[in-house]
């Protein structure tokens, strides 16, 4: 794997999903562009041999099971939602870098001793609902569902 080329290609593809005429990105939580981007990341996870799954709010987890200590997990990632006309590296670079690092480690060393997970959080920006870190709050169990009035928008 050519790391630099892989990162560029993944960023280029993600940047095409939700791109706007001004050169920025608009991928609001649960929008069609956000969902398309999450599914692209899910496909990339599966392509490198990860088990990929969404939780109930749309956080996406890709996992490679550890060979010796599978219950111990090293997790890395970020988010792919944006504000209106957001930057092309904000959030998604962390997801792409994490995915590429796990791929590189697996190709070079094989199955890890500890489990590795890449996460693409459902939301960080707070651009869709009057709350921030919706994905993270759900992940750690401190979310207040009253902050998000219309949970029926969730269709992963």
Q: Could you describe each region identified by the protein language model?
A:
Residues 154-156:
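Conserved small/polar residues in nucleotide/adenosyl-binding loops
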Residues 19-65:
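A non-catalytic alpha/beta surface segment that caps or lines the substrate-entry region
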Residues 44, 48, 60-93, 98:
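Catalytic-core environment of secreted peptidases
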Residues 12-19, 37, 69-72:
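N-terminal glycine-rich anion-binding loops that anchor highly charged ligand groups
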Residues 76, 85-124:
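Alpha-helical metal-binding/catalytic segments enriched in His/Glu/Asp
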Residues 1-31:
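N-terminal capping segment at the start of a domain
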Residues 120-152:
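Flexible glycine-/small-residue-enriched beta->alpha junction loops
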